[in-house]
Every structure is written in C-alpha cells, then in structure tokens.
Amino acid sequence: MSAQKNGKSTVRSVRWMRAVGAAAALAGALTACGGSGGSSLPSSPGAKSGGGKPAAMTQDQVVAAAPVAPASAITAGSWMDKIRKRGTLEVGGTDSGAMFSQRNPATNKLEGFDAGLSQMLAKYIIGKPSTKLSLTSVDTRETMLQNGSVDAVFATYTITPQRAQKVDFAGPYYESGDAILVKASNNTITKPADLNGKTVATESNSTAALDLKKFAPQAKTLLFREDGECVAAVTQGRADAYVLDQGILLGDAVNDPSLKVVGQPFTQEPYGIGLPKNDPEAKAFVDAWLKTIFADGEWAKLWKATIGTKVAGDPPATPVIGSAAGS
C-alpha cells in the first residue's frame, strides 16, 4: 500500500482493526467447540432461537428487496445503459468458492456473498437480478475485462496498484487478509514464521504468492491455478499449508472439517469489483451503489444471509470506498 494522508490512514487503520477483530471471531467460531483440535460450526443464525427470534433473510430475499437505480442515473450509451439494454450483467467469477460464490447442486443457483452482490448490482441496473457467470481465475480476470468478455469481476479480487494499471476497481466492498490453512491434526504451524522450511501451496499470480516471499522467505512454494487444487495439495500431503485470503480459507474449512484455519490474518486484502479500465462513469456508478447498500443496511443483510449462515458474529464494519491504493 502507498502512504496516505494521516487522517485517512487513521480512519482506515481503525476500520482494519475492526475487520481483523471480526475475522478473528469468525476463525474462532470454526474451532472453539473442538477441545481435541477438531472444528465444529455454530448453529445457523437463520434458525429460530428458543425465544422465538425470527429467521434471518435468505439471499434471494435480500436480493429481492435490493434497490433499483433511478432512470436519471443511467446515461445513454454508458456502461450501465448497455447492460440494461442487454438485460443481463455478465460477471466474471467462480462457482466453487464457499461462502462467496458457490453453485448449489440442488438448485443450480449461485450462492454466497460475491454472487449475491453481483445479483444486487444487476437488479440495480436492470431492475431484475439477471446475471451470467463466466468462470475466471487469477490468471484471466484482467484479460476478460480488457477484451469485454465480462462487464465486471466479483471474485474476492484484491485491489492492488499493479492490477489497477490494467483494470479499474470499485470499492473496496470487503476487507480480508492472508491466513494459513492446515490439516486439523497439524499443531506445529500457527503463524507465518512457522512456514519457513515447509511446503506451502497458494494460487499463482495471487497477492499471497508475493506475501509468502516476505513473511516466509524460506518456504517452498507450490503454485496452483485454483483454490481447489491448493486444498487438495494439503489434504493429500503434498503441501504442509495453504496461504490465501482468510475469507476463502474459512469457506474451505467449512466444506472440509479435516482442515482448519490457524492464527490471525497477517496482511490487508481489500476486495474490489473489477471493471473495464478508463471508464470513470462506470466506476463512479458502482461506487455510488456500494455506498447506497452500505448505508441502507442491504450489505449487512447479505452478509448475514451468506457468510453469516456459516460463522457466528455480527457483520464487520464496511470499508471506506476509495481507501485502498488502486481503488
């Protein structure tokens, strides 16, 4: 991150500490009930309590209640106008990211925080949550935005100045940080320094691949294209650990109780919505939409309907739009 003015930096630091605290609470929720090291999940916040507390909204309900942009906000010939006329928001992302964007095999619907946000943006522009997913990886996200294959990328996409040279970012809309995933039986790795001398999996072209060189320079790094390949390397014993954004790793641990997330996040990973480069009107529009759903509580409702169904605690503080270098 580049240096920022003291006032802005202080605000961001406070918000980051809140986000780290919330992330720590989420990680603790996955492991707190297992005295022998195994993980167990808290009960879903969507269930009624003994006192008759009403069930939380579902993702579909949150999206259905989301706002629609006024006609005056969509100018003729703009990025938004083209999407509205087409009737579908074409999204780059994944269908295998637990808690963020994962396809439900029973319904064939995409579920998760990123998936829900893309549906809410589609509704804001079009009036209905019509999206079309094209699968992307860390290697193809910029290219797909540059060649017009997708309108936007929702993919736990960390904002960096280097990436911002190729694409624009709206946001940040969520803050995470690099963390460590290991087998639940592993009690020797708890912090980045413990990775030195170990074999560590991560995604190629990810910020984590660069972070490992800084925080664990003696680690042997195995690079893979996708999250699932990194998880398999750990479960099969080819890697001792897997380093990536904590939000993604928590989802992996939810899916596979033989895994656990250890320690605290040791970097800042602000997620942004990838947009075509040099379209300030599109970026301003999406930033304004994010501010709207932050302020009216729709962002928090979506968090509760997605991530909050798997982990305990309140939604984290919303990031400051434009606070990340590159946003």
State each model region's role.
Residues 131-193:
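Acidic, polar ligand-binding/catalytic clefts
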Residues 174-182, 250-290, 310-327:
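Periplasmic-binding protein-like
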